[in-house]
Amino acid sequence: MQLQFRSWMLAALTLLVVFLIFADISEIEEEIGNSGGRGTIRSAVNSLHSKSNRAEVVINGSSPPAVADRSNESLKHNIQPASSKWRHNQTLSLRIRKQILKFLDAEKDISVLKGTLKPGDIIHYIFDRDSTMNVSQNLYELLPRTSPLKNKHFQTCAIVGNSGVLLNSGCGQEIDTHSFVIRCNLAPVQEYARDVGLKTDLVTMNPSVIQRAFEDLVNATWREKLLQRLHGLNGSILWIPAFMARGGKERVEWVNALILKHHVNVRTAYPSLRLLHAVRGYWLTNKVHIKRPTTGLLMYTLATRFCNQIYLYGFWPFPLDQNQNPVKYHYYDSLKYGYTSQASPHTMPLEFKALKSLHEQGALKLTVGQCDGAT
């Protein structure tokens, strides 16, 4: 009997170890309700690992030497100028779209809809599962009745990241020519129009932006600055991740109240509760072992649903540019960031490597230098 008990204990411990190893992916699969995902999804980026040691890639820009991320010497990128050699791979783009649709549907997951919630409903935060929030009247009023991207389709889309690599790029005019332009975290555009453009069709706003860029609206001056930025959106989609973490609740409510009080002309959207885990599940299944997807990667994943061709600007998670010059983390402020810090919730260099590989294969175009025709 004692031997049998020990055998059962050993079996239980073995199962526990296996569970801990695969808990992350198992949790994702459970939450997105895709029990067959791991076995049935074929990787759209199945060459990522086979190419992980390649140093050369064709990206639009000037002829540079190898770029080394000094914070992590194992990540090196030789970037050659040959924008004319890039060709869109429509077959691959369609394959990626089809595979992502097995995890999420951007048309539906881009926002919770008014018919699915009512004031007072309890929601568990995505990152603070033991914490809850009640759907406020203001939030309910701003929920869209239908998806802001329902039946939408665009020939070309630009996703504009916020890296300082955009400075002096002269990409503004090119960015504005795209059918649909996505920007991140209410980044300012007026003062940087030559490099980042002005057109905005969708802009994200993490709640932390209110603290970092608008001093938590401590007085009328900062509230007016935020209002000016919101009014400048002029009918664009304002995408607010309201259900991520408890710490953002008050900031989301402040913004909602301002929008309603001042009748700001924006179309608010609040991503579905399953979106982040579904996006992460897709990339993990394709062996891109991210922690938490950045806003830029989220936007790319969503854009595959409604964009024929996707162009990325301002994606550069390294402290030096192609010519070994310092690059600001954001083009518009002096914030510092540890790209390879273990404490970071993101794995930006790894994401960049994946996007770079997709650029090589023609699934997207990644611009990290000056745009064609820039002076």
UniProtKB/Swiss-Prot annotation:
Q: Which reaction does it catalyse?
A: [N-acetyl-alpha-D-neuraminosyl-(2->8)](n) + CMP-N-acetyl-beta-neuraminate = [N-acetyl-alpha-D-neuraminosyl-(2->8)](n+1) + CMP + H(+)
Q: Which GO terms describe its cellular component?
A: cytosol; early endosome; extracellular region; Golgi apparatus; Golgi membrane; nucleoplasm; perinuclear region of cytoplasm; plasma membrane
**What spans does the record annotate as topological domain Cytoplasmic, numbered to this chain?**
1-6
**Keyword line:** Cell membrane, Disulfide bond, Glycoprotein, Glycosyltransferase, Golgi apparatus, Membrane, Nucleotide-binding, Secreted, Signal-anchor, Transferase, Transmembrane, Transmembrane helix
Q: In which pathway does it act?
A: Protein modification; protein glycosylation
Instruction: Kindly list the residue ranges recorded as spanning the membrane.
Output: 7-23
Gene Ontology biological process terms in this record: ganglioside biosynthetic process; N-glycan processing; neuron projection extension; oligosaccharide metabolic process; positive regulation of neuron apoptotic process; positive regulation of synapse assembly; protein glycosylation; response to cocaine
Q: Which residues form the active site?
A: H346
Q: What is its main location?
A: Golgi
Q: Where does CMP-N-acetyl-beta-neuraminate bind?
A: N162, N185, T294, T295, G296, W316, Y329, H330
- Identify a single GO molecular function assigned to this protein: alpha-N-acetylneuraminate alpha-2,8-sialyltransferase activity
Membrane topology annotation? Single-pass type II membrane protein
- Family per record: Belongs to the glycosyltransferase 29 family.
Q: What is this protein called?
A: Alpha-2,8-sialyltransferase 8B
The uppermost taxa in this organism's lineage are: Eukaryota, Metazoa, Chordata, Craniata, Vertebrata
